[in-house]
Amino acid sequence: MSCSKDYLNLMHIYLDGDITREDESKLSRHLEDCESCQKHFHELNRTITLMRSAERVEAPDGFTENVMANLPSEKKTVKYRRWFKLHPMWTAAAIFLVLMAGGMISTWTHSSDQLVVSAQNELIVDGDTVIVPAGVTVPGDVLVKNGDLLLLGTVDGDVTIFNGKILDNDSEMNGEGLMASVGGVNGELETIDRMFEWIWYNIKNFFKGVFSF
């Protein structure tokens, strides 16, 4: 088609429905005299008519769900990595707790049976027994590991026993989780003879020290 592009533009304007009466008359006169433009115009008109008459194709019911269900599932390792990237603080805290627990388990399993006592001068050590003498008040918390504690006096604080028991004059005291103001202890009595209790005790004391600053 060797005619001016102006007529081609007029064809598009006509098909869009925006042509003026003057331009429409001008295009009509040209199409009557130009067979090539007339053929091109009919092809454009037919194409648009076919496109408008074509039915809209819709996907069958459940098509999207079926496609999503057939997609390969995401590996769990990828999910975990994404979660770790989105929660760096929780990840660091979890790693710290795992390492801390591992170190405490190692300490528990490889520790010797040697008696360990907190450093109050008022305490007396007799073999595997730590004695709070009668009439004596021991200030602060008392810790005894791999031994027993005989209470004849008073402890002005908490008492914690690892791998041992708390004694009074005549019998063993059940100190687990007990709060006492009678029997020589003005604080919390706690006996620890299992690994997980040991881990929890250290974690609790660690965070208690952190939040005390």
Curated annotation (Swiss-Prot):
**InterPro entries per the UniProt record, alphabetical:** Anti_sigma_zinc_sf (IPR041916), Znf_put (IPR027383)
Q: Which cofactor does it need?
A: Zn(2+)
Q: Name one GO cellular component term.
A: membrane
* Protein topology in the membrane: Single-pass membrane protein
The record's comment on cofactor binding reads: Binds 1 Zn(2+) ion per subunit.
Q: Which residues lie on this side of the membrane: Extracellular?
A: 109-213
Q: Enumerate the UniProt keywords alphabetically.
A: Membrane, Metal-binding, Transmembrane, Transmembrane helix, Zinc
Residues annotated as binding Zn(2+) are 30, 34, 37
Q: Does the keyword Zinc apply?
A: yes
A matching Pfam family: zf-HC2
- Post-translational modification, as annotated: Is processed by three successive proteolytic events. First, the extracellular region of RsiW is cleaved by PrsW (Site-1 cleavage) in response to cell envelope stresses. Next, it undergoes cleavage at an intramembrane site (Site-2 cleavage) mediated by RasP. This cleavage uncovers a cryptic proteolytic tag with conserved alanine residues in the transmembrane segment, that is recognized mainly by the ClpXP protease, which completely degrades the protein in the cytoplasm and leads to the induction of the sigma-W-controlled genes.
Q: Which residues lie on this side of the membrane: Cytoplasmic?
A: 1-87
UniProt entry tagged with the keyword Metal-binding: yes
Which top-level group of life is the source organism from?
A: Bacteria
Which molecular-function annotation in GO is an example for this chain? metal ion binding
Enumerate the transmembrane spans.
88-108
The text of the family note is: Belongs to the zinc-associated anti-sigma factor (ZAS) superfamily. Anti-sigma-W factor family.
Q: What does this protein do?
A: Is the anti-sigma factor for SigW. The presence of RsiW leads to the inactivation of SigW, and its proteolytic destruction to sigma-W activation.
Protein name listed in UniProt: Anti-sigma-W factor RsiW
Name the species this protein comes from: Oceanobacillus iheyensis (strain DSM 14371 / CIP 107618 / JCM 11309 / KCTC 3954 / HTE831)
